[in-house]
Amino acid sequence: MSQRIFLPDTLANWQWPRHLNPHYAEVKKASAAWAQSFRAFQTKAQEAFDRCDFNLLASFAYPLADEGDGCDLMNLFFVIDEYSDVSTEEEVRAQKDIVMDAIRNTEKPRPAGEWIGGEVARQFWDLAKKTASSQAQKRFIDTFDEYLESVVQQAADRNNSHIRGIESYLEVRRCTIGAKPSFALLEFDMQLPDEVINHPVIKELEKSCIDMLCLGNDVVSYNLEQARDDDGHNIVTIAMNELRTDVAGAMIWVDEYHKQLESRFMENFKKVPRWGGPIDLQVARYCDGLGNWVRANDQWSFESERYFGKKGPEIIQRRWITLMPKMVSEELGPQIVDGSHL
């Protein structure tokens, strides 16, 4: 008999509701066409990539945005993710160098025959930086570099079959999830000084938010990742290993830890200091954006076909799924999820 898994409803009491950007349809059309133009994947994998609808994630995460920068960034993230997941540490290091060179030198044409991720990154940042404040630009570049460095570390762990402990894993996962550069987009139209964005309360808010994103993503992605034999960088596997428990026990632990993070976030949300003037309005919008990101990530996970195929809307209600059989990939890139197995 197939093993059944219960997905904890970690956001049952989360105060931020589902909020979709009203421009979703038009920005999705433009960004999806842009992403497809690079031909980063073969036909079947590209279809699976399209079904993941990373534009939907961006439209949940940036519900007030007028531009499609968030959509383009999410598409860039997942191009990097799909390639790095099947690459060696040395290959991922080279990919990182290409992407950061492209971002730092958007006016420079990319060399013929170079990995396509460089041109995707160059085009994204060449357009996105035009609408970003100087502070937000710097923070994006710094945090994107940090994100890519952590992806190199993830590749090293994978190549060495290294399973980390919970704390060590979270240190790396806080970067591989890509939340910090995603948060930089929240402040593209803001003028937040370093002393504001680096205030201890703001930093704690970000940390709790990131940890909830990590746990939430790992819970919904575990089944697909174990089927692809790529679950070594997942809190469910990490908890099973450290706590010497099974999948059900790990899910219970994740649910309890998520509740602690939620309480910590709300406590700090109430402690956000005031600086006076328009800064306070920008800070309020930024912090609200953090809370919304948690909901956005969860909502997209079930409304797209990334993890559950067409069964997501049903699974978000019943929460029970069946452990998927092992999958063999025929092409580089995402695979279409057959929801009938869930």
Curated annotation (Swiss-Prot):
Record key words, sorted: Lyase, Magnesium, Metal-binding, Virulence
Residues the record lists as binding Mg(2+) 2: 81
Residues annotated as binding (2E,6E)-farnesyl diphosphate: 306-307
Cofactor: Mg(2+)
Protein residues bound to Mg(2+) 3: 217, 221, 225
Motif interval(s): DDXXD motif: 81-85
EC number: 4.2.3.135
Catalyzed reaction equations: (2E,6E)-farnesyl diphosphate = Delta(6)-protoilludene + diphosphate
Keyword Transcription regulation: no
Molecular-function annotations in GO: metal ion binding; terpene synthase activity
Residues at which Mg(2+) 1 binds: 81
InterPro entries linked: Isoprenoid_synthase_dom_sf (IPR008949), Terpene_cyclase-like_2 (IPR034686)
GO biological process, one term: isoprenoid biosynthetic process
Any Pfam family matching the protein: Terpene_syn_C_2
Presence of the UniProt keyword Ion transport in the record: no
Biotech utility: Melleolide sesquiterpene aryl esters are cytotoxic secondary products with anti-cancer potential. Armillaridin shows therapeutic and radiosensitizing effects on human esophageal cancer cells. Armillaridin induces autophagy-associated cell death in human chronic myelogenous leukemia as well as of hepatocellular carcinoma cells. Armillaridin can also inhibit the differentiation and activation of human macrophages and thus might have potential to be developed as a biological response modifier for inflammatory diseases.
Protein purpose: Delta(6)-protoilludene synthase, part of the gene cluster that mediates the biosynthesis of melleolides, a range of antifungal and phytotoxic polyketide derivatives composed of an orsellinic acid (OA) moiety esterified to various sesquiterpene alcohols. The first step in melleolides biosynthesis is performed by the delta(6)-protoilludene synthase PRO1 which catalyzes the cyclization of farnesyl diphosphate to protoilludene. The orsellinic acid synthase armB produces OA by condensing acetyl-CoA with 3 malonyl-CoA units in a three-round chain elongation reaction folowed by a C2-C7 ring closure.
Note: Armillaria species are both devastating forest pathogens and some of the largest and oldest terrestrial organisms on Earth. They forage for hosts and achieve immense colony sizes via rhizomorphs, root-like multicellular structures of clonal dispersal. An A.ostoyae colony, known as the 'humongous fungus' in the Malheur National Forest in the Strawberry Mountains of eastern Oregon, was found to be the largest fungal colony in the world, spanning an area of 9.1 square kilometers. This organism is estimated to be some 8,000 years old and may weigh as much as 35,000 tons.
Family stated for the protein in its record: Belongs to the terpene synthase family.
Descriptive protein name: Delta(6)-protoilludene synthase
Gene name of this polypeptide: PRO1
